[in-house]
Amino acid sequence: MTASGALQPALYLAVLIGLSVPLGTYMARVYQGERGLMASVLGPLERLAYRAAGVRPDQEMRWKDYAFAVLAFNLAGLLVLYALQRLQGVLPLNPEGMAAVPPDLAFNTAASFASNTNWQAYGGESTLSYLTQMAGLGVQNFVSAATGMAVLVALIRGITRKTADTVGSFWVDLVRSTLYILLPLSLLLAVLLVSQGVVQGFGGHQSASLLQAVKDQGGSAVVEQVIPMGPAASQIAIKQLGTNGGGFFNVNSAHPLENPTALSNFLEMLAILLIPAALCHTFGRMVGDRRQGWAVLAAMTAIFAVLLVACVASEQAGNPALSALGVDQAASALQAGGNMEGKEARFGITSSALWATATTAASNGSVNAMHDSFTPLGGLVPLWLMQLGEVVFGGVGSGLYGMLMFVVIAVFVAGLMVGRTPEYLGKKIEAFEMKMASLVVLFPAITVLVGTAIAVTTEGGQKGVFNPGPHGFSEVLYAFSSGANNNGSAFGGLGANSPFYNTAIGVAMLVGRYAVIVPVLALAGSLARKKLVPAGPGTLPTHTPLFVGLLTGTVLLVGALTFVPALALGPVVEHLEMTR
């Protein structure tokens, strides 16, 4: 690893952790209803939203009512987004005359953005109108992120309350997440991105003359190029901050009008993990012990750092096939070195690998390089990060409530080892809690493995595989890992825009999102009804380095046992073939 390669990740993590503390404290105050400067400014808008929706902010919900509100609201959003896509040909703000999106692709896209996955089987600048991008995708970027944050807050209330029947109001949590957190941060980031050259406007696509004419596939001369435009900066800000990831343009943040400079690249990378990291501090403050938040953040950071080093090292080592031909792949003052296939020369190896690790540690899925072109072991890192359940930082809200399920499992395992009923923050962890935590871990994993098996054994799935052998299998495995874990990134060599993949991955995204949310809320309701148990001599401290190690081991062990056989058939075999 070069000096630059070591400095960039270190600077990134330092800034990330430094900003996460004040932001986490601020978010805790928002969810606890503490009034501050933002409340005095945005309070009237919050109250207006409640009146317009007919919501009583002081009326809390049982966990079943909370879950019903989540499902109903998200279903309504999915249907509206589907309708927008099907009708965009006759709706305004469509200067390029985009036609209606086909039914299977419209379903896939609606399921994708409603579930905070942002899997894209289309090219944004060639498929969707400005209205669909803004009123459809942009709105879902906000509310899907706010949904995950709301579910997390409900779980935290379940942990902290005693003998209570309610876990809060979904509508209040949704509005506060959007109004006080996501909107201000998105506005700030959008302005910064515009200052760096990210486009923002409603004009049609622009034409520019080429310096040198070229010929197309038919032999005709091409003398000008079309430059796509649109309201990109506003959507890019929330797609990064909300761990959504769906790009305004087809190549996402590798596009020079979506990510033009080194500063915009750093800001967009920082935005991916900012809220997930800060929510760890929010958790610590809301449970009354900040050490708990630091412990969870330490486990996340440890896994992230190790896998980041593995990804950078694998990409910097280059391609053995090119080395055999005498190609110079060493880093120097004139080149980044390593495996530069599928990467922007302006970003190089380290920034590309850092983004890939961050975007799959979180359920973001945006890219500034093509993951399909990574080396087998370099591509294994983002693949396995998703398969761990998107709990290494993870999505906004969803990452932390997923990690807390692993905390429950780790506490239970520790209790078994000492023969004592496990406890977490004064609440006994019993059979029901273990069942719910197990469902959260099992549903995405089963969806990934079953979906991959169906795809590689049926004609509809096989038609989309253009690369034979282990890499083709890796592409299918990556697609279902991305969909079921609500990430949205892809190995781009898979022909995913087909009725089979649009339907199968669409279903996988819905299962991976909502079959997880319901057990999490059920666990929250169960914990809220329990009494607090005083800590005793046999209580396992959950803020120590020992517990951080136990939690890290639990996450890695579950991920290894579940997916190592599948990984052995894909990237591991491909690596062995490449190096023999």
Swiss-Prot record:
Q: Mind telling me which InterPro entries this protein's record contains?
A: KdpA
Q: Which UniProt key words apply to this protein?
A: Cell inner membrane, Cell membrane, Ion transport, Membrane, Potassium, Potassium transport, Transmembrane, Transmembrane helix, Transport
Which parts pass through the membrane? 3-23, 65-85, 136-156, 179-199, 263-283, 293-313, 399-419, 436-456, 504-524, 546-566
Keyword RNA-binding attached: no
Please indicate which superkingdom the organism of origin belongs to.
Answer: Bacteria
| One MF annotation (Gene Ontology) recorded for this entry | potassium ion binding
Name the GO cellular-component terms: plasma membrane
Record-stated family: Belongs to the KdpA family.
* Task performed by this protein: Part of the high-affinity ATP-driven potassium transport (or Kdp) system, which catalyzes the hydrolysis of ATP coupled with the electrogenic transport of potassium into the cytoplasm. This subunit binds the periplasmic potassium ions and delivers the ions to the membrane domain of KdpB through an intramembrane tunnel.
How is the quaternary structure described? Answer: The system is composed of three essential subunits: KdpA, KdpB and KdpC.
Q: What is the protein name for this chain?
A: Potassium-transporting ATPase potassium-binding subunit
